Regions:
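Juxtamembrane "anchor/assembly" segments of surface/extracellular structural proteins
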Residues: 14-83, 126-128, 210-282
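Soluble non-cytosolic domains of exported or imported proteins
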Residues: 138-146, 174-182, 241
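Classical Sec-dependent N-terminal signal peptides that target proteins to the secretory pathway
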Residues: 1-17
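LysM (lysin motif) carbohydrate-binding repeats in extracellular/periplasmic proteins that recognize
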Residues: 158, 194, 257
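Extracytoplasmic/secreted envelope proteins and their assembly/folding machinery
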Residues: 105, 145-152, 181-185, 244-248
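Short beta-strand-centered interaction patches in the first periplasmic/extracellular domains
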Residues: 118-128, 161-230
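Surface-exposed cap/loop segments at beta↔alpha junctions
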Residues: 75-156
Length: 282
């Protein structure tokens, strides 16, 4: 695992005017090299539409939630007429200097009539397909992994990473007219398990975490815009950080918190000045 430090260039004469976000950050691999990152960029796609300006974004991802969600909001100067169908594919990317990373993949969560102006488009990740897939069967001599693989296949999904732990075979498990999400909860209950499951990057995880190749460091006065504790959790505010995912580890250097922590939630959204801010919870 490689450790990285994300540096902000704090140029105080520019801070109030906003160009801080055009000088945004440095990405430094310890004792190896520093990569300068300028000019934050966005790209939001819903169905056949692509938006790179005139929109505000909000992306929510939490390991305590079954699904990630996002919203593409249109500014007062930009009210397009959209024609979108529920389950049209959707992607939101954030990044710098032409290098963008997916922060959301999923689908449009409802229908949008082309005859009306839209204020926003709501999106849900692949769990939307699981919510609309009904399981109605009795399963014999099976394991949790076999059942979950079947549920995913019924929803038309094949990318998954399931726990490699060995569980005893259950002789019979009836599931009657439950969504695939409810069916997974029934499987967990039948085996007495309390394990997380979610999608990340289009891959379904059950009692597993997405691979992490880099650990990023956040430091007071360098790349932490604000750090506060509320509701029993810490909230760290920084600039657009598309490379931070929930269940990943980050390293903190701050008088209040120091050391490595696991991210429980990530929210990226447009602030009142029109810039993307990422809020990391742990």
């Amino acid at each position: 695992m490689v450790f990285f430090t994300l540096f902000l260039l704090f140029v105080f004469p520019f801070l109030q005017a906003g160009p801080l976000d055009n000088w945004v950050s440095f990405l430094k691999e310890a004792a190896v090299e520093t990569k300068e990152l300028y000019y934050p960029q966005i790209s939001a796609q819903a169905g056949s539409y692509t938006f790179e300006e005139g929109v505000e974004l909000e992306i929510y991802s939490s390991k305590s939630s079954y699904y990630d969600w996002a919203k593409i909001r249109f500014t007062s100067q930009f009210r397009p007429k959209l024609s979108l169908k529920k389950k049209d594919p959707a992607t939101i990317q954030l990044g710098y200097d032409g290098t963008l990373e997916d922060v959301f993949t999923g689908f449009v969560s409802g229908n949008y009539d082309g005859g009306t102006y839209a204020n926003e488009v709501a999106l849900k990740d692949e769990m939307l397909l699981m919510e609309e897939t009904i399981i109605n069967d009795t399963f014999l001599d099976t394991t949790p992994q076999e059942l979950i693989s079947y549920f995913l296949a019924q929803a038309g999904l094949s990318k998954m990473k399931l726990s490699s732990k060995t569980y005893p075979t259950r002789k019979m498990l009836p599931i009657r007219r439950q969504t695939a999400v409810q069916a997974i909860n029934a499987v967990n209950a039948a085996w007495g398990l309390r394990v997380p499951f979610f999608f990340s990057g289009g891959v379904f995880y059950w009692d597993e975490k997405p691979e992490q190749k880099k650990v990023y460091t956040f430091e007071r006065g360098v790349n932490i815009l604000n750090l506060r504790r509320a509701g029993g959790v810490w909230e760290l505010e920084t600039v657009s950080a598309p490379f931070i995912k929930h269940s990943h580890k980050i390293n903190l250097i701050h008088p209040q918190v120091s050391g490595e922590v696991e991210v429980s939630k990530v929210v990226s959204k447009t602030n009142d000045s029109g810039f993307i801010r990422t809020y990391i919870y742990f």
